[in-house]
Amino acid sequence: MSRIQKTFAALAAQNKKGLIPFITAGDPEPGLTVDLMHALVAGGADVIELGVPFSDPMADGPVIQRASERALANGVSLTQVLQWVREFRQTNADTPVVLMGYANPIERMGEAAFAKAAGAAGVDGVLVVDYPPEECESFAVLMRDNGIDPIFLLAPTSTDARIEAVGKVASGYVYYVSLKGVTGSATLDLDSVAARLPLIKKHVNLPVGVGFGIRDAQTARAIGSVADAVVIGSRLVQLLEDAPRGQAVESLRAFIAGIREALDA
């Protein structure tokens, strides 16, 4: 059983919903990343999604784009991100860490070299935004051979064929993008999410995390009423951008604790 599977099994046994926060590695400053990861756990995160900075993050809105730019300006690389996961693992052996990013940095390192390095660092899942599941079989096998779950996105526009393709290659969980558009988009249509999830579950025998458009305890709780897990990203990255210097870690912990409380209520 992978760390991600164990986490979702424990949540199901307690009838709880998963909380999956996203932060960009190296933002707002590189020295804070490991502390921020621990703050997320202290606040009640079940899985951490760690964004790998990239110069052209096409699926991301302006908030996460700016975070990527700040991290890259500070010289943050994929190798550095793996080092932070290794450091986090020195004192946390239980919380799954999922890297989320784009194909380019992985391909520059080489898929096999990346899979080996990520597995050795303690990475549990990898979500490559621009890897279509139909063309990912060998990549998925490479990930699993190194103890990593390949995670894929589904969207309101995903066809049955795409959902089936994800069902064949994904493990861990799938990430359902609840809105058309980029991360940080505004309104959330709960009814359409609720209608879509059973169709996904027909083809994908995995927990479904729902993200995009979740900004506060209220929207998190609404999504938690229909999904297995709630993914929250842009709102956290915005919070870190706005937090006064020296207060980022505690601000993040407190915000996540509020979301956790709402999910468990």
UniProtKB/Swiss-Prot annotation:
Alphabetical UniProt keywords: Amino-acid biosynthesis, Aromatic amino acid biosynthesis, Lyase, Tryptophan biosynthesis
Catalytic activity: (1S,2R)-1-C-(indol-3-yl)glycerol 3-phosphate + L-serine = D-glyceraldehyde 3-phosphate + L-tryptophan + H2O
Record-annotated active site: E49 (proton acceptor), D60 (proton acceptor)
Signal peptide start-end: none
Enzyme Commission code(s) on record: 4.2.1.20
GO terms for cellular component: cytosol
Pfam family, one: Trp_syntA
UniProt entry tagged with the keyword Lyase: yes
Gene Ontology MF: a single term: tryptophan synthase activity
Pathway, per record: Amino-acid biosynthesis; L-tryptophan biosynthesis; L-tryptophan from chorismate: step 5/5
PROSITE patterns named in the record: TRP_SYNTHASE_ALPHA (PS00167)
InterPro entries reported for this sequence: Aldolase_TIM (IPR013785), RibuloseP-bd_barrel (IPR011060), Trp_synthase_alpha_AS (IPR018204), Trp_synthase_suA (IPR002028)
NCBIfam families: trpA
Protein purpose: The alpha subunit is responsible for the aldol cleavage of indoleglycerol phosphate to indole and glyceraldehyde 3-phosphate.
Membership in a protein family: Belongs to the TrpA family.
Subunit structure: Tetramer of two alpha and two beta chains.
Protein's name according to its UniProt entry: Tryptophan synthase alpha chain
Species this protein is from: Cupriavidus pinatubonensis (strain JMP 134 / LMG 1197)
Classification lineage: Bacteria, Pseudomonadati, Pseudomonadota, Betaproteobacteria, Burkholderiales
Gene from which the chain derives: trpA
